[in-house]
Amino acid sequence: MIISAASDYRAAAQARLPPFLFHYIDGGAYAEHTLRRNVSDLADVALRQRVLRNMSDLRLSTELFGETLAMPVALAPVGLTGMYARRGEVQAARAAAARGIPFTLSTVSVCPIEEVAPAIERPMWFQLYVLKDRGFMRNALERAKAAGVTTLVFTVDMPTPGARYRDAHSGMSGPNASLRRMLQAVTHPRWAWDVGLLGRPHDLGNISAYRGSPTGLQDYIGWLGANFDPSIAWKDLEWIREFWTGPMVIKGILDPEDARDAVRFGADGIVVSNHGGRQLDGVLSSARALPAIADAVKGELKILADSGIRSGLDVVRMLALGADAVLLGRAFVYALAAAGQAGVENLLTLIEKEMRVAMTLTGTHSIAEISADALSRVTRERAETISP
C-alpha cells in the first residue's frame, strides 16, 4: 500500500487489525455524529492564502510547559495502544522522541509507566482519570513522579462511559465477545503472531502493578466501569493539584465557563476535546468549540486541542482557531498498527511537511504567527457566531 498522506494509514490499519481492535479505535459514541463532525467541521475551516511573503525561513518549533517541541504536536493518551503493535506504547514513545515531541501514556496502557519511561530520553507525559479508587490515583501519581514524568494530563470528561454501539457489533463487547475476538485473531495471523503472541503480556500494566495481579481485557472493562466517579467536582481535584508540582493539563473542556474554572483551579493548560466523539454524541466538535474558549482564556493558560485532526493542514487550522498545540490520537494509532515505530515516525514527518506547505501558503513564518489572521473572512465570521 502506498502511503502518501497521513490519512492513508487508516486503510492500512484496517487491513492488518482484527475488527474488534480497528473499530474500537475508529468508532465513536451512539450514532457517531460528533465523530464525523470533528473531521468535517475542521475540513470546512478555510485558510487565508497569502503570496510573495519571502517564506524561505520557517520555524515550526515551540515552547510548551518548559519543553521545546519540534512542532506544536504531542501524541495523545490512547488506551490499549499495546494491542495495536507489539509493546505499542514503547514504540509510539520512541517515535515521538525521535521526532522531538512528547508522548502521553494512558492510565489504561498495556505497557506500564516503568517500561515506557526508560525507553526514551526525553520526559514523557502521563494521563490520569478521575476514579473512585483514590488509592490507585495516588499510586499512579507517585509512580509517574518516580519515572520522571513532567506533565500530568488529567481527563475529566469520563464520569461515566460513553455508549459505543460499534463495540458490541465488532466483538470488543456484547454477546460471546471473547469467542468472537479469538476467531478474529485466527483470521489475522500477522497480528496474532506479532502482537497476540510476541507482544505479551496483554494486561493493563499500570492497573496490574497496583492490584498485584494481571488485569486482562475483561477485568479491565469491569474494574474501570466500577471506578468511574459521577460525583466528581472541582474541589475533589485539589489534593491532586497540591500533590503534583509539575504542569497539569485538564483534558475534556468544551465550554468557555469550564475553561474559566480551569484557570481558577490553577491548571497550566487545557485540552479542548470531546474525547474524539467517544463520549457524548451531539456535542460541538472541537473545531467549533475552540474559538469561544480561546476568546475566554487565551493567555491565561495553554490551550491544546484534539479530535478530528488527520493532517498537518488540520494542525494549522486548529492553531488558527486558537490552540497553542494539538494532540494526535487516532492518527498515530493507525500508523502504529500499520507499521509500528517506523509508521509513527513517518506519520509525523508527513504532518510536518503538510504544516510547512500550509504555513508557506498562508504567509506565517512561525507558530506564534499562526492566528485568526490566517483564517479566511468567511471562517472568522462563522467562528464569531459561537460566543463565550
UniProtKB/Swiss-Prot annotation:
GO terms for biological process: aerobic respiration; lactate metabolic process. FMN binds at residues 106, 127, 155, 251, 306-330. Its EC number is 1.1.-.-. It is a peripheral membrane protein. It is found in: Cell inner membrane. It is an enzyme of class 1 (oxidoreductase). It comes from the Bacteria. Keywords: Cell inner membrane, Cell membrane, Flavoprotein, FMN, Membrane, Oxidoreductase. It catalyses: (S)-lactate + A = pyruvate + AH2. Its cofactor is FMN. The active site is at H275. Residues 1-380 form the FMN hydroxy acid dehydrogenase domain. GO terms for cellular component: plasma membrane. One of its GO terms (molecular function) is FMN binding. Belongs to the FMN-dependent alpha-hydroxy acid dehydrogenase family. Catalyzes the conversion of L-lactate to pyruvate. Is coupled to the respiratory chain. This is L-lactate dehydrogenase. It comes from Xanthomonas euvesicatoria pv. vesicatoria (strain 85-10) (Xanthomonas campestris pv. vesicatoria).
